[in-house]
Amino acid sequence: MIIAVTGTPGVGKTTISKLLAEKLGYEYVNLRDYALEKGIGEMKENELEIDVDELREAFGRDFKGKNVVADGHLSHFLKADLVIVLRANPKLIAERLKERGYGREKLGENVEAELVDVILVEALEENENVIEVDTTGKTPEEVVEEILNLIRRGVKRRVGIVDWSEVYDEVLPYLRL
């Protein structure tokens, strides 16, 4: 089974993906590292630009029939059996990205993406089985336990549980207006 863990930068993808893979006994794959290793994409202005179609094809070929947790904000473009879209309060994302040294424009772009569900919408356009999980105020262990419970119960689709419209005013200073 291929489980893709995706979300806006700063939601906890890597932490959750590694823990989920460990709990399930699955292989963990960081998509950025995988793309670099396979020569998929190129560096442009200090960012790796990845050809999503090439990534999807190579990943599908290399991991077909394997149990894998794929970690990356492009993982929802893979042919996955299940896509987990991690969400977090946009203000929390802003704080985390600021700590990581993100510039104002990139920070604003990602806060806005979380605020208006960009990753979730993309995931739903690409996949049938999408589960949305709000990580706000939860430990990584709690998030993984929630995911495992949903998987055990056979839940393949759970979306629409997050609405950040009430925090819009709080994140306004971070947005690129």
From Swiss-Prot:
Domain of life from the UniProt record: Archaea
Stretches for region NMP: 30-50
Ribonucleoprotein recorded as keyword: no
Known EC number: 2.7.4.3
GO biological process, one term: rRNA processing
SUPFAM superfamilies, alphabetized: P-loop containing nucleoside triphosphate hydrolases
GO MF, any single term: ATP binding
Sequence segments annotated as region (LID): 99-109
InterPro entries (UniProt xref): Adenyl_kinase_AK6 (IPR020618), P-loop_NTPase (IPR027417)
UniProt family annotation: Belongs to the adenylate kinase family. AK6 subfamily.
Assembly with partners or alone: Interacts with uS11. Not a structural component of 40S pre-ribosomes, but transiently interacts with them by binding to uS11.
Task of the protein: Broad-specificity nucleoside monophosphate (NMP) kinase that catalyzes the reversible transfer of the terminal phosphate group between nucleoside triphosphates and monophosphates. Also has ATPase activity. Involved in the late maturation steps of the 30S ribosomal particles, specifically 16S rRNA maturation. While NMP activity is not required for ribosome maturation, ATPase activity is. Associates transiently with small ribosomal subunit protein uS11. ATP hydrolysis breaks the interaction with uS11.
Protein name: Putative adenylate kinase
Annotated organism of origin: Thermococcus kodakarensis (strain ATCC BAA-918 / JCM 12380 / KOD1) (Pyrococcus kodakaraensis (strain KOD1))
